[in-house]
C-alpha cells in the first residue's frame, strides 16, 4: 500500500471527471472521487476507492474529502480539478452575482482544493495537479463568457503556482478541451473542428493521466489544448 499512488478527482461524477477517475484507476492509482450529485460517491466505491458527496464550492466539504483520503492512504499524488457549468448570458447582461458564481465555478474550485492539497504534495516533495479548463481561454467566445474570463485567470494562477512550487517537484497544468462528447452534439460545432468530430471524454482523461504521470515530470505551468485543431492561434 505504501507504493500505491493516490489520485483525488474533484468534480468526478460524470463526463470528463468520471472518465479521468476511471483512467487513473486503470493506470494503478487508488482514487478518491467527489461530486455534488452522488454519482462520484458511487463511482469511487465502484473503483475500489473513496466516494464522497460534497461541493467544490465548500471549503468544509473539501477539507473532509482530503482528510478522508489522508486517513485511508496517507498521501496524495495527483489532484484533478473539474468544474460544473457557470452562468451564460449576453456580456453586458451578466450580473455581479453571475460573475461571482462564474468565478466560484471555474476558478475558486481550483484555488480551494489546491490550498488543501498542495501542502501535502510539498511535504512529499512530489505531486501533480491537473485542472480541466477550456480551449476558449486564448480565443474567448460569447457562448461561454464567465468560463472564458475566469479560466484566463486560472491560466495566470497556474503560472504563479508552477513558478513557486516547481522546486518542490509539485506541478500544475491545465487541460483545454474543445468540443467534447459530454456536451450536446451540434453539426455546426462538429463541422468547425478540423478533425470533423467531437473529442471524447476518454481522450481528455488520457491527457489528464499523462500529465499526472512521471512521463510528464518536466511539464508544469502549461495549458495543453485537446481540441482537434479548433483553435487557430499559434
Annotated model-derived regions:
Residues 114, 150-151, 158:
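Active-site helix of classical SDR
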Residues 119, 163-164, 217:
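Alpha-helical segment proximal to the catalytic Tyr-Lys
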Residues 94, 140-148, 160, 189:
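Active-site loop-to-helix junction immediately N-terminal to the catalytic Tyr of the SDR YXXXK motif
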Residues 13-14:
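Conserved glycine-rich cofactor-binding loop
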